[in-house]
Amino acid sequence: MYLSKIYIKNFRGIKELQVKFDNNLNVIIGANGQLKTSLIDAIRLFYTWGEPNRDIEITKEDFYVEVTSNVDGSTTVTPSAKIDICYMFEGLSAQQEGAFYQYLDRKDDGTMVARVHLCFEMKEKGRIVSSYITGKEENGLRADWDTFYYFHPYYLGALRDSTRGLMSTRNNLLGRGIKRKIDRAGSEDDVKSIVDRANDQLLQRQEVRETQTGINDNLVQISRTVLKDVELHIEQNRIEYIVNIIKPFLPYAAADKQGFMLTQNSLGFNNLIYIASVLSDIKDCHVDDAVSIYALLIEEPEAHLHPQLQVNLYNFLKNADD
């Protein structure tokens, strides 16, 4: 299942636009100011529709403004009051037709497609009201909200920081992938036991024991009855915290356990590491989930890359779905 067509009306600088997509790789080419980012953001609007903390929202500045020059030399400015974005998905599997039955519509050739229509209307006092329709427009059907969780975007913006995405200590890309493999293997207890052993060894260090003793000595002076002994340990109650401290690095040599941190690496190479991690994560997700839809959206993929690396990246992405 893939996004095969998008129709956009009155969104930012786009008065009306329809774009068709290939089921593998799509490259959007244009000069500055040709609204390439607006097209990408229109796609992101739906793919993040079911996320509780969306990183993109419609504001009053997103409504198209019509500027007309009059014969008397004056200018008339007419802001639109409604944004419409329609999405069509093709290539549905039997499982996806079942999961997205509320989205289905039949084309003239008999094949089934999934349709979604997002609408944003400007109301009084600048209030923006959003709504959606799935399936045939005339039916006015609204699919269950939970179905939007099947759509997953990975986005690298033009002013991106892929290093931060790889090094974050909360819900980072690498940690999610490792956590999924641990869940599949049922090895959470084994991983926690490794941390337990490290915990025991670390707590025997003189530096740690002295710190703990200093805390408790002060507590005795402050409160003799309420707090007596405080213990120290590595927090390992949740497996997510454990895997999120695993970070990529560049070893000095093949067998070396020491090396350069990503913050010491070039931005271009870090972009490649991030893209490789995303594609690995997407392929791994398909092992357990044959329904969800994933999209990798990259603005200015050439950023920080030497021309030869740009060619290598393009050739790789062409076959990334194989």
Can you say where each PLM-predicted feature lies in the sequence?
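Extended helical coiled-coil dimerization/tether regions that scaffold
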Residues: 165-169, 177-298, 307, 319
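Conserved P-loop NTP-binding catalytic core
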Residues: 40-107
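Switch/communication elements of ASCE P-loop NTPase nucleotide-binding domains
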Residues: 1-48, 251-322
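Electropositive, glycine-dotted interaction segments
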Residues: 84-86, 90-196
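Conserved catalytic network of the ASCE P-loop NTPase/AAA+ motor domain
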Residues: 76-80, 109-111, 122, 146-150, ...
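Flexible glycine-/small-residue-rich
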Residues: 23, 87-91, 157-160, 234, ...
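Short alpha-helical segments and helix-capping/turn motifs at coil-helix boundaries
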Residues: 66-73, 100-104, 135-143, 217, ...
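Beta-strand secondary-structure signal
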Residues: 5-7, 18, 84-88, 115-117, ...
